[in-house]
Amino acid sequence: METDMNEERTGVVTFKGMPLTLLGKPVSVGDAAPDFQVLANDLSPRTLADYKGKVLVLSVVPSLDTPVCDMQTRRFNTEAAGLSDKVRILTISCDLPFAQSRWCGAAGVEAVETLSDHRDLSFGLAYGMVLKELRLLGRAVFVICADGVIAHAEVVSEVSHAVDFDAALAAVKTCLSK
């Protein structure tokens, strides 16, 4: 899982109009999804291999304790009810696992698994999503088909704006039809 942390991209994202720098290697549709290691709410490690054979929605947010991230995670939690059991929705942020667990309990979110990239930014670097100036993840959604290939990749250019839910869900349906 070696990624050059010094790989920087500018001109891709802003936060409330302020330009930010993304660290890590960006991914594109058609790429094999890179592996990563994050922490579950119980502090156990999770890697891409833990979800082998599933269609994955990776909902990437800076922090669950912000309004747009809260809305994004709640929306995917609602959408999960209408999806096949072959689909897993993972929300990844740099929030501590304890904070993620508390937030899920307070929000009644049970259909989305929250995962923390706070420890070593493994996910953020592997997907080119680390906001250098904030040491948080940018906002994005990635859909990975069961064969491990990225079917949808949206990096939101203004971090305070929402992802395109319809496009992500359409990609999930395409993956399920393969």
Language model regions located:
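Chalcogenol-based redox active-site neighborhoods
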Residues: E2-K178
